[in-house]
Amino acid sequence: MKILGIAVVAGAMMFTAGPALAAPIHGNASITCANGAIASGAYRNITVTGACSVSAGAVISVSGNITVTRGAVLDAQSAASTITVRGNVTALSSALLGLGCQPASYVGNSGHACTVDPLDHSTIAVNGNVTALNTGTVLLNGITVRGNITALGGGSEIPWSIKNNTIGRNVSVAGQTTNWLGVLFNDIGGNATLLHIAVTDTDPGAHGAFVVQNRIRRNLVCLGVTPTVTGGLFPGEPLNTVGGRALGQCAALA
């Protein structure tokens, strides 16, 4: 079941070790990562143009923004790290954005284990928004976002996971054609909206998009999701907690 085994994706995305990017001597410089691991340091902005990861145990602070350009990869979900972004994180067309990993024992559910050390966990906070625009893959696991998570378009054969996050405002996911998508165990301060999403996995246990045990302060809205939306694997499981209304295909999931 993908809801229990999303973390296996992390193993497939480990890169051949490249040279680590040295932290700026005086800090607060903007850098571009074309390959390899981003090391501990204080940066103004980080732009990812190739296949980049973060060093295990890295402590990274970004006073501005992180941008993952078209077709690039930011893997901050295979090795545990501490990342603080004062601005926004944006991933563009066909990119892969992976932020956060933690064991099941840390979160109390299936988790998303780090590949480098399955018992370790990330601490990642974004003060602004996380935005994915026609992005190939989005993996957000156990991070804090003070603004919005917005994913418009995109998709791939890699399952998408928005899981165990704390989001200050809204989660909006729309227009994907992707193998699998789960919005799971999140604390959402505003609305959660899923619109016009096609899930292509033919596994009989896939059940379309999963919207499972989220705490949503305002409304939960699901429209045009195919083949369906499900609130869990088994009858009688706890549903989503919604402070406003549950509407559309998610009307019965709260």
What are these regions (language model features)?
Residues 1-22:
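Secretory targeting and sorting signals
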Residues 23-71:
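N-terminal segments that cap or nucleate solenoid repeat domains
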Residues 25, 32, 238-254:
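Short, low-complexity, Pro/Ser/Thr/Gly-rich segments in the mature regions of secreted, periplasmic
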Residues 37, 50-53, 58-60, 72-73, ...:
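Small-residue (G/S/T/A) turn/hinge positions that recur once per unit in extracellular repeat modules
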Residues 49, 55-57, 63, 69, ...:
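Feature marks extracellular polysaccharide-active and adherence modules
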Residues 53, 118-120, 129, 244-245:
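Feature marking well-ordered beta-strand scaffolds used for ligand recognition
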Residues 79, 91-122, 150-151, 155-161, ...:
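Acidic/polar low-complexity surface segments
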